[in-house]
A protein has these predicted regions:
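Non-catalytic accessory segments flanking enzymatic or RNA/DNA-binding domains
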Residues: 1-218
Length: 218
């Protein structure tokens, strides 16, 4: 059996993963279960068959291309949308070529709203070259509890990561998704070594904003 893209569901969480067969999918889901302590009871809400491993990886790359500009600190993307709209986006990505990527991205951009909650907040996390797409109602609760000026800070942070080429390579992706304790110094050191002073300044500002945000939410 060729690789498949699985869309998995557990409570309010959604993930995608590429698996060689159902047995691989079970193993991957087990690792997710262990990590997030969600217990058993996974439900596959969709399985997208592909004709080859290369095609599966290409589809995963397309998904990443569309959603990557929204990745921010702690793996949270502020896209509010309905589950139906989210799955429709995946379907569009499957049938798209590179020329239509920007159109899909533009559609998503118009769909999400920071102040009027009418869908879910989705996130993507990169781990060992596998990307999980998901949503969490806990972040919605936190977001809605923020004051307007605090939301504006977070919006400003999103604008940083949507600007120009800031999310084009893995180091910058890590900068957006890093764990403060484990990776921040390593990422900052890398950015300094490659001489990207503007990116370094932006990352410092993002770190300041989100450390403050985390304190307010705890």
């Amino acid at each position: 059996m060729y690789n498949n893209l699985y869309i998995l569901h557990k409570d309010n969480y959604y993930w995608t993963c590429i698996g060689n067969d159902s047995e691989y999918s079970k193993k991957y889901r087990l690792s997710l279960t262990d990590r997030y302590e969600l217990g058993s009871g996974w439900v596959e809400i969709g399985m997208i068959p592909t004709n080859s491993e290369a095609e599966a990886k290409e589809l995963q790359l397309k998904i990443n291309t569309v959603f990557k500009p929204f990745i921010i600190v702690n793996s949270v993307i502020l896209i509010t949308m309905t589950q139906e709209f989210f799955l429709n986006c995946i379907k569009q990505i499957m049938n798209s070529d590179n020329n239509s990527m920007l159109a899909i991205l533009d559609t998503i951009t118009r769909e999400y709203d920071y102040t009027k909650k009418y869908g879910d907040v989705y996130f993507i996390e990169c781990k060992n070259n596998k990307y999980k797409i998901g949503c969490t109602t806990d972040f919605v609760r936190r977001w809605n509890s923020l004051k307007n000026e605090e939301q504006n800070q977070a919006i400003y942070m999103i604008d940083i990561f949507k600007s120009n080429d800031i999310y084009l390579d893995e180091a910058r992706l890590q900068c957006a998704c890093y764990n403060y304790k484990d990776n921040s110094n390593k990422v900052m050191k890398y950015i300094q070594e490659v001489g990207n002073s503007e990116l370094y300044k932006k990352c410092i500002e993002v770190e300041r904003i989100w450390k403050d945000y985390d304190k307010r939410c705890k």
